[in-house]
């Protein structure tokens, strides 16, 4: 017997409500397959060329603002069983040229599959928090701007942790870290896309609408880099090369999480990445 699956929503966003005993997870992207089946490197190169042709903003001495709306599946072991909860978050980073800045983060109450799980939950129950720091008071992925050439960007993103090579998943994860803290002008976006185009495992999945209602092209790679087989995806604006979203989806097994695969465990929507003064 197949259990029914419905939808729930909050603040204009939706997620799946799962059958009893199964935690809620964000809905999968509905992807329209590409018509021509052209290889991912070619599609990315064309998007990169369009991004590079856009006028560059004056960035010297300017403040960056990065706004992210995200959904995370959290797990907690209690009494020998795993409790999973879906939590929506919003994060607004303001980063000034001298390195000082502010993060305003808000977390909505976690969603549980039962009241019993809610009572057992010992982690964050939501709320808002503002963090400020002076120049030099916070570490970032890199204190310098991302380079606009592929060779320099490859070195910029490299990190000496296993595996000790800049593989496809490590590259995408490093890009994600930068996107969470930097506004990328067109030249830097183009370099990101051209570096992505070098990854041999990367696939062009097709076209999809993100959770903010924007259309973009989906590029993915499959890997068990984090321990479980998963799909790592970016959603890109085909006209500007802007990164619209990031998704991490378990593909074949949920491990200890009480979810049904395929299951999205992380979805981040990059709502704003601009220079504001």
Model regions and ranges:
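Intrinsically disordered, low-complexity prosegments and terminal tails associated
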Residues: 4-277
């Amino acid at each position: 017997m197949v259990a029914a699956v419905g939808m729930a929503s909050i603040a204009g966003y939706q997620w799946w409500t799962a059958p009893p005993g199964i935690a809620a997870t964000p809905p999968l992207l509905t992807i329209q397959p590409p018509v021509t089946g052209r290889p991912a490197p070619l599609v990315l190169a064309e998007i990169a060329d369009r991004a590079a042709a856009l006028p560059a903003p004056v960035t010297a001495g300017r403040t960056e603002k990065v706004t992210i709306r995200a959904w995370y599946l959290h797990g907690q072991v209690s009494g020998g069983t795993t409790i999973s909860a879906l939590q929506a978050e919003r994060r607004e980073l303001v980063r000034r040229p001298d390195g000082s800045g502010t993060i305003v983060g808000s977390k909505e109450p976690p969603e549980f599959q039962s009241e019993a799980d809610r009572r057992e939950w010992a982690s964050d129950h939501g709320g808002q928090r503002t963090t400020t720091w002076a120049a030099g008071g916070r570490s970032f992925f890199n204190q310098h701007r991302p380079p606009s050439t592929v060779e320099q960007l490859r070195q910029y993103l490299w990190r000496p942790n296993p595996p000790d090579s800049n593989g496809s998943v490590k590259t995408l994860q490093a890009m994600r870290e930068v996107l969470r803290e930097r506004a990328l002008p067109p030249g830097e976006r183009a370099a990101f896309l051209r570096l992505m185009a070098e990854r041999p495992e990367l696939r062009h999945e097709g076209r999809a609408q993100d959770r903010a209602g924007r259309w973009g092209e989906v590029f993915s790679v499959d890997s068990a880099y984090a321990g479980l087989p998963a799909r790592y995806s970016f959603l890109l604006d085909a006209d500007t090369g802007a990164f619209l979203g990031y998704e991490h989806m378990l593909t074949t097994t949920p491990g200890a999480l009480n979810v049904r695969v395929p299951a999205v465990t992380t979805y981040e929507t990059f709502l704003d990445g601009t220079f504001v003064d």
